[in-house]
A protein has these predicted regions:
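Extreme N-terminal starter segment of soluble prokaryotic enzymes
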Residues: 1-2
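Acetyl-CoA-dependent GNAT
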Residues: 5-79, 84-85, 97-99, 103, ...
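Ser/Thr-centric signal marking residues that sit
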Residues: 65, 116, 121
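Active-site acidic-Proline motif in GNAT/NAT acetyltransferases
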Residues: 84-86, 90, 118-119
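Residues forming the Rossmann-fold NAD(P)(H) cofactor-binding site
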Residues: 94
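Conserved GNAT acetyl-CoA-binding A-motif
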Residues: 104-116
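Single conserved hydrophobic/aromatic residue that forms the stacking wall/gate
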Residues: 120-130
Length: 130
C-alpha cells in the first residue's frame, strides 16, 4: 500500500471511493457537479489553493483519501477524509491526521478544523442502537 499525492487523473477513483463510503449511510449521496467539482481536477485544485490532497493506493486502486486547505488566518481545514470500509481499523486515517498535525505545527497553525454532517447514520450503527 502506498500513500502519495493525488493526481488529476485520480478524480474518478476518488469519486468512486466516496460513493462506496456513502453506501453505508441512509440518504447520503455525492453530487460531484454541484457539491464537489474539485474532485475532477483534485491535484490542481488543492495546489492552486495552497493545500494538498493524498490518496492511499493498494493494487492500483484508491482505498483512502484526505486533503487540507488553509482556513481563515491561522487554521487548516481537512477535506474529504475517506477510507474504504475494507481497509478501516488499520490506522490509515490516523496516519493522515498525524501528517496534518505535523504540517500545522510546521506552519504555526493554531487549529485544524473539519466540517461534517450528523444527519447521516450508518445502518450498522442503527442496528447496534436498536
Amino acid at each position: 500500500m502506498q500513500l502519495r499525492l493525488a493526481r488529476n487523473k485520480d478524480g474518478n477513483q476518488i469519486i468512486n471511493l466516496i460513493k462506496r463510503c456513502f453506501k453505508d449511510y441512509k440518504n447520503c449521496y455525492l453530487d460531484v457537479d454541484n457539491d464537489s467539482p474539485e474532485l475532477r481536477d483534485v491535484y490542481s485544485y488543492f495546489k492552486n489553493k495552497k493545500g494538498k490532497f493524498w490518496v492511499y493506493v493498494d493494487k492500483n486502486k484508491i482505498i483512502g483519501c484526505m486533503g487540507y486547505l488553509p482556513h481563515e488566518k491561522n487554521n487548516l481545514e481537512i477535506h474529504k477524509l475517506y477510507i474504504d470500509k475494507n481497509y478501516r481499523m488499520r490506522g490509515l486515517a490516523k496516519k493522515l491526521m498525524l501528517r496534518i498535525e505535523s504540517i500545522a505545527k510546521k506552519y504555526k497553525k493554531r487549529k485544524i478544523v473539519l466540517w461534517t454532517c450528523l444527519l447521516y447514520t450508518s445502518d450498522a450503527a442503527d442496528e447496534r442502537n436498536s
